[in-house]
Amino acid sequence: MLEQVGPGKIESLRWEILCSEQWDHPDDLGLRARYAVFSVQRTGSGWLCDYLRQCGLGVPFEYFNHAFASRIAERLGCLERGGLLHVGRCIARLEPLRARHGIFGTKLQPDQLRSMSAQSDARAIALLDRFDKLILLRRQDRLLQAISLARAHLTQQWQLYGDDPARGVDVDDEVLFPMIRDHLGKIANDERYMTELASKVDPRAVRTLWYEELAEPHALESIAEWLWNALGAGAPRPAPDRRLPLARKRDEAESRAIKARYLALVGTAS
């Protein structure tokens, strides 16, 4: 079993199920197209992937997160000696099992791509070129993004599902603010890496979506429609499966209060 995340059980159970064979179903249409949600942390990628799963656009998930990848690779027979992941073999075995309507989707983050490509930009671009479509997910307010990332690390709670209670930050600003500063630097570095690589991919294959747009239903639907029109081979689009849960939107009051205190301190220091 995967370790329970935060104070709730629903998120942990969801990860457990997505790593298990429960979602492994060879698609009658085989595999004809691939896409990736390429994002820095805390940009709403989990939420977007939930929505795209509802829409039958593959089973997008964070397959290359080491904690999940090792578990999936072990049952697919893709672990080498010493527990090393054979990426190519794992992808080849996973894609036919997780395609839906002929489409495979995955979530991908900069550190995962760095690891998969052995820090080679040329290899990273070659990996990105395997995808027919690439969604760049970004966030305009990087300070709130860094605060969200710090909070997730402190609480070990990345999304909220069902009635899982939200856990607040319980450390002093003397501990929290250096974490936020470090995360701001990491986010800037990852953004630069992501956008520079994406600029080397065919621009017709790339679409950018901002976190701040995700609250608008038409933004999610626009991405789903774009993917289906490009990858659905002209077939009628399937009806969404609303039984599959979406993450709850977290109340940002705590994060905005932290932001105000952080900016006040920065202003005082300058």
Question: Predicted segment positions?
Answer:
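PAPS-dependent sulfotransferase catalytic domain
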Residues: 109-196, 204, 214, 221-234
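The conserved 3'-phosphoadenosine-5'-phosphosulfate
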Residues: 55, 64-74, 164-171, 179, ...
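PAPS-dependent sulfotransferase catalytic core
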Residues: 1-99, 243-250
